[in-house]
Amino acid sequence: TYLKAWDDVRKLFAATPAARKAKITPGAFSFNTPGGRCEHCQGTGITTLEMHFMADIEVPCDECGGRRFKAHVLEVRYRERTINDVLAMTVDEAAKFFADRAAVSSKLECLRSVGLGYLTLGQSTSTLSGGEAQRLKLAGFLAEEKRGRGSLFLFDEPTTGLHLQDIHVLIGVLDGLVSRGHSVLVVEHHTDFIAHADWVI
């Protein structure tokens, strides 16, 4: 939802013959608003058990079995997949699945370009590391980027928790921003990253 790709996915599901026949609108495929989502878990697919003297435990929702939506919504399929199946896909898998749908695939490619292809579409932003959250915001900018006046980007240790290969992907994305007229200021301790900087303070 952060890149607004989910709006286009919901429209694709609502345009299927099964959805039209059942008069299911795009709103029913949203896990953020009432309608088609499971109201017991409010579209999260999980419920929290309070353990009082221990840490709370998250378990699959009893009502929907962790599938987030009501049964009649889950009956609708797009290319043999339910809406929950799509939420369970990684960004990489979804990019292939929606390759011929430019409105969706272009936004997913922005996520892949910043090295977030391993995230699932239904993953909560609260589970992301600080570095992942920063790269998600960067992908959001890339999806909406307009040519012209440059912007200043500030990053606070964006390599936290990243594999060396992912760090090189991130460096490539930041180099791309600079080459298009933007400025990038980074607080960082990773020596490979620092070695790539134009200026070190």
Predicted regions and their residues:
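Conserved phosphate-binding elements of NTP-dependent enzyme cores
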Residues: 1-201
